[in-house]
């Protein structure tokens, strides 16, 4: 009986995460070293990044003329500056081993930040092993050296800062992340909601202006060279994705995947889901319905509220998951954004721990199938749908201050 109580306590009591988390990070550091030692580096975009940076260093500032062996430069300015630093640190990209070590450090730093966010949200210890077990996530960071690792680090730093009400610093970290890869724009609706609830309308607008100004400052060298070319390349929202690389919607068939109607349907679903979350859960801390909230907001009578750390993290990750669910094409590196979000979202959806582990494992399997199949892509969409609709259907509990409870069981505080 005492053993059963000890295991129950160890798995469910959040206070144990203060020693479980550091042990997992240390263990993962050894795992990263083993991966770098035993598994060959995979060349995908690193050489192209370095070729593009070489052109930038040589003086080229026209984004439309910065290209590499696998294509043109399609990421914003902060990506260029980040990889310029890596260019110099890795002997112009030739010392790939050192680059892998740097990305392993980046991975571990991000993991530590993620675990702090989880601890501040009161997450139970049984979730934490899921944060270090992903094969695909390790691959994205230490075997492929994708820029998504840098963007994900900025995203989680921003979430941590938002949890601690460091709004200006949080927006700065987030917009720098957007400047690396615009995938982080998926968090914009959540940031708007939490800042308006916490600060009211005018301070939120100021933060939005700050984010925009930082983007302009980062882009000045390129805006002086070819402003239209920079915006069109770095923030291209109409890019056509190739069906053969898609991880999520392969099962719908190529004709439907490439159709404009499908793209518009996903956009409509994205907007609908965001609106549904706003009306059913995200505005609940204000204590008013949407019309009353908007009326008070526009009249300057809105009362600010103190948001819990768990609420802020859940809203941020839900906004991300909605965007990924409604994205027309996800590539393998996009798993970097989702992997660390999934355990939290499944937990906030009040799923049983066994079910959480099962869905996590299914999702991990699907993202490791290469090339994707109808079955794997169906699982990718299904697992995302479980996370989004699980939180939606349990929004009263998922977006509350208290940890989720399962019937007949209680998380020990």
Swiss-Prot record:
Q: In which pathway does it act?
A: Protein modification; protein glycosylation
**Database matches in InterPro entries:** Glycosyltransferase_ALG3
Q: What class of enzyme is it?
A: transferase
- Single GO cellular component term: endoplasmic reticulum membrane
Q: Which domain of life is it from?
A: Eukaryota
Subcellular location(s): the record lists: Endoplasmic reticulum membrane
Q: How does it sit in the membrane?
A: Multi-pass membrane protein
Residues in the Cytoplasmic compartment per record: 40-95, 161-181, 229-261, 326-372
Q: Name one GO biological process term.
A: dolichol-linked oligosaccharide biosynthetic process
Molecular-function GO terms, alphabetical? dol-P-Man:Man(5)GlcNAc(2)-PP-Dol alpha-1,3-mannosyltransferase activity
The role this protein plays is: Dol-P-Man:Man(5)GlcNAc(2)-PP-Dol alpha-1,3-mannosyltransferase that operates in the biosynthetic pathway of dolichol-linked oligosaccharides, the glycan precursors employed in protein asparagine (N)-glycosylation. The assembly of dolichol-linked oligosaccharides begins on the cytosolic side of the endoplasmic reticulum membrane and finishes in its lumen. The sequential addition of sugars to dolichol pyrophosphate produces dolichol-linked oligosaccharides containing fourteen sugars, including two GlcNAcs, nine mannoses and three glucoses.
Give the PANTHER family listed for this entry: DOL-P-MAN:MAN(5)GLCNAC(2)-PP-DOL ALPHA-1,3-MANNOSYLTRANSFERASE, NOT56 - RELATED
What family does this belong to? Belongs to the glycosyltransferase ALG3 family.
Name this protein carries in UniProt = Dol-P-Man:Man(5)GlcNAc(2)-PP-Dol alpha-1,3-mannosyltransferase
Q: Which organism is it from?
A: Aspergillus oryzae (strain ATCC 42149 / RIB 40)
- This chain is encoded by the gene named alg3
């Amino acid at each position: 009986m005492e053993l059963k109580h000890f295991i129950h306590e160890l798995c469910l009591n959040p206070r144990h995460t203060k020693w479980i988390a550091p042990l997992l990070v240390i263990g993962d550091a050894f795992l990263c070293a083993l991966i770098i030692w035993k598994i060959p580096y995979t060349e995908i975009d690193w050489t192209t990044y370095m070729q593009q940076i070489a052109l930038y260093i040589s003086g080229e500032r026209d984004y439309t003329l910065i290209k590499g062996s696998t294509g043109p430069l399609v990421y914003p300015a902060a990506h260029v500056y980040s990889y310029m630093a890596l260019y110099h640190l890795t002997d112009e990209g030739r010392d790939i081993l050192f680059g892998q070590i740097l990305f392993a450090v980046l991975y571990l730093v991000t993991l530590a930040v993620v675990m702090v966010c989880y601890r501040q949200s009161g997450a139970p210890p049984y979730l934490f092993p899921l944060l270090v077990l992903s094969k695909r996530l390790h691959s994205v960071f230490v075997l492929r050296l994708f820029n998504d690792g840098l963007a994900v680090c900025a995203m989680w730093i921003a979430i941590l800062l938002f949890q601690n009400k460091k709004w200006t610093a949080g927006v700065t970290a987030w917009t720098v992340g957007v400047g690396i890869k615009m995938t982080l724009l998926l968090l914009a609706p959540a940031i708007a909601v939490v800042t308006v609830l916490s600060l009211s309308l005018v301070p939120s607008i100021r933060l939005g202006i700050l984010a925009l100004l930082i983007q302009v400052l980062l882009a000045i060298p390129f805006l002086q060279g070819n402003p239209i070319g920079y915006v069109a390349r770095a923030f291209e929202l109409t890019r056509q994705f190739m069906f053969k690389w898609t991880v999520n919607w392969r099962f719908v068939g190529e004709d439907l995947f490439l159709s404009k109607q499908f793209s518009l349907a996903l956009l409509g679903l994205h907007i609908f889901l965001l609106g549904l979350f706003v009306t059913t859960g995200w505005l609940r801390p204000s204590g008013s319905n949407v019309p009353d909230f908007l009326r008070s907001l526009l009249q300057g009578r809105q009362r600010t509220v103190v948001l819990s750390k768990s609420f802020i993290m859940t809203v941020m990750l839900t906004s991300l998951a909605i965007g990924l669910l409604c994205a027309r094409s996800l590539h393998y590196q996009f798993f970097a954004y989702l992997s660390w979000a999934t355990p939290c979202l499944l937990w906030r959806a009040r799923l049983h721990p066994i079910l959480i582990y099962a869905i996590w494992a299914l999702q991990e399997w699907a993202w490791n199938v290469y090339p994707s199949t109808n079955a794997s892509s169906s699982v990718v969409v299904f697992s995302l749908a479980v996370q989004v609709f699980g939180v939606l259907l349990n929004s009263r509990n998922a977006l509350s201050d208290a940890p989720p409870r399962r019937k007949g069981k209680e998380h020990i505080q």
